[in-house]
């Protein structure tokens, strides 16, 4: 964990692996296709219960930088708003995290839902070899969606570290926004540093995205929280990585914000996929 902040830091499959995901979940209220593509096939779930589900509607690598760097994106289903899922750090393999889940299949049966692999994860190209900040990551996602011809409005849903990305995207692109969901996202720390947790240094081998996590994410958002006009749902898991009180800090990001508590662990979308999907669809209709 990161200095007591509750974020697991490790690789998929390790004891402290961080399989972070983005979802919206049902609970008890407790507070306030396109261009530049190199398409690649993939094995995807084809059923939701006994109902057939169509193959991906977007599936490929899309150019996000002038030097030719590409990120991998997959979308399923049709409809609007589009739900964009963002996983945590350092496990930025959103497609692997979300693709083979009942939660994702339920969403795709009702609207378009997209997941992507951030830089140096899955089938995406390596990140530039320099410190990267929140603007860099949001620019990657914005360019990726544009290159793939995936239009808004969007519901940005991010778990743990991915929630910071979702909230900052919302701050930067309010006109493309239908809502934001934060799943078990601890409040940012104003003091977290690489001296305390060496693995979050931008050039540490455990940080292949080269994200400058201390000053450019944790400290930045603790001192200047993202702000946006769209509805915000803060999900706190009863067995998750941070308390209800801690995560209430995110509520100031939107005037239309509330917090819910869901029984489950950090990956609560796996514990209650039907409830998670139902709550997302409720937000889409607002």
Give a label for each model feature:
Residues 180-210:
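Flexible "cap/lid" loop of the alpha/beta hydrolase fold
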Residues 2-36:
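Secretory targeting and sorting signals
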Residues 26-52:
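C-terminal region of N-terminal signal peptides and the immediate post-cleavage residues
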Residues 115-155:
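Active-site loop/oxyanion-hole signature of alpha/beta-hydrolase fold enzymes
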Residues 202-269:
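Conserved serine/cysteine hydrolase catalytic core
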Residues 151-189:
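Conserved hydrolase catalytic core segment
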Residues 65-123:
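Conserved HGGG/HGGXW glycine-rich cap/lid loop of the alpha/beta-hydrolase fold
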Residues 270-282:
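Post-His helix in hydrolase/transferase enzymes
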